[in-house]
């Protein structure tokens, strides 16, 4: 059955692009699942680690090129660096207040890493690192654990007051407190799944539509559709990085601001 489908040009495997593979593997098998994709250990260098390293190098290049020759009349690289700096700095200050600005370096690093991971995944033959929960979950957990620790460090036991809705009638406050606690611990789940799900869905759709390009009759339509979706995915890549970052700022505000509702 698989052979017949392949001859029709419709053998589409949109999820193969998300398979984690070892970069150094001796097998010559072309099967989707072989020893290059199984028995992967923490010390193995995979396509995920390679593209995360590339993202870090891109971020470093942007910042180094944008700041090495600062001038009153900025160059293009300096303009890009200043635009990113001003955009994230204003976001942090507006959402978290003046007290949260001291955490701006972490927020900007997080934004640039997610943005580069999203955008690099649109390149041909690349790998979208932010489509994997193995990447987005640690990012979300770092935010969750860091914000929680910071909240207790700055407010002590008073940080728990954020779960007690004083504006609600006393009779329903215990129920609301349970809901608030549950929603708080669900934060890293929604924070990570939102990013990974959006990036995976968009790339899978592109792969499915591109699979029909072999049909000559509809190929012009397919090329146009893929181009349009690529443009949309570029927008989604930026928006998802923004959403991930602004949610981080919102969570940070709970820790550095007033814990009361």
UniProtKB/Swiss-Prot annotation:
Alphabetized PROSITE patterns for the sequence: ATPASE_A
InterPro entries for this protein: ATP_synth_F0_asu, ATP_synth_F0_asu_AS, ATP_synth_F0_asu_bact/mt, F0_ATP_A_sf
Sample GO molecular function, one term: proton-transporting ATP synthase activity, rotational mechanism
Cellular compartment(s): Cell inner membrane
Highest taxon above the source species: Bacteria
GO cellular component: plasma membrane; proton-transporting ATP synthase complex
Membrane-topology descriptor: Multi-pass membrane protein
Record field: transmembrane: 45-65, 107-127, 133-153, 162-182, 209-229, 232-252
Pfam families cross-referenced by the UniProt entry: ATP-synt_A
SUPFAM superfamilies listed in its UniProt record: F1F0 ATP synthase subunit A
Family: Belongs to the ATPase A chain family.
Its biological purpose: Key component of the proton channel; it plays a direct role in the translocation of protons across the membrane.
HAMAP family, per database record: ATP_synth_a_bact
Subunit structure comment from the entry: F-type ATPases have 2 components, CF(1) - the catalytic core - and CF(0) - the membrane proton channel. CF(1) has five subunits: alpha(3), beta(3), gamma(1), delta(1), epsilon(1). CF(0) has four main subunits: a, b, b' and c.
Name recorded for this polypeptide: ATP synthase subunit a
Organism: Cereibacter sphaeroides (strain ATCC 17023 / DSM 158 / JCM 6121 / CCUG 31486 / LMG 2827 / NBRC 12203 / NCIMB 8253 / ATH 2.4.1.)
């Amino acid at each position: 059955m698989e052979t017949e489908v392949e001859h029709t040009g419709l053998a589409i495997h949109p999820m193969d692009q998300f398979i984690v593979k070892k970069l150094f593997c001796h097998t010559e098998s072309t099967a989707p699942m072989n020893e290059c994709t199984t028995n992967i250990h923490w010390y193995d260098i995979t396509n995920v680690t390679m593209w995360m390293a590339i993202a870090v190098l891109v971020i470093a290049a942007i910042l180094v090129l944008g700041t090495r020759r600062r001038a009153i009349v900025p160059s293009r690289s300096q303009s890009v660096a200043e635009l990113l700096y001003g955009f994230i700095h204003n976001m942090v200050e507006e959402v978290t207040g003046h007290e949260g600005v001291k955490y701006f370096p972490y927020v900007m690093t997080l934004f640039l890493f997610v943005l580069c991971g999203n955008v690099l995944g649109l390149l041909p033959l690349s790998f979208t690192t932010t489509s994997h929960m193995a990447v987005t979950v640690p990012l979300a957990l770092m935010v969750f654990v860091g914000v929680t620790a910071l909240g207790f460090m700055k407010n002590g036991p008073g940080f728990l007051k954020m779960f007690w809705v004083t504006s609600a009638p006393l009779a329903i406050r215990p129920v609301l407190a349970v809901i608030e606690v549950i929603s708080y611990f669900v934060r890293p789940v929604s924070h990570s799944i939102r990013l990974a799900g959006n990036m995976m869905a968009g790339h899978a759709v592109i792969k499915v539509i591109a699979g029909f390009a072999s049909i000559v009759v509809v190929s012009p339509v397919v090329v146009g559709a893929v181009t349009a979706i690529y443009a949309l995915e570029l927008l989604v890549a930026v928006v998802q990085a923004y959403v991930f970052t602004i949610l981080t700022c919102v969570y940070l505000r709970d820790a550095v601001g007033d814990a009361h509702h």
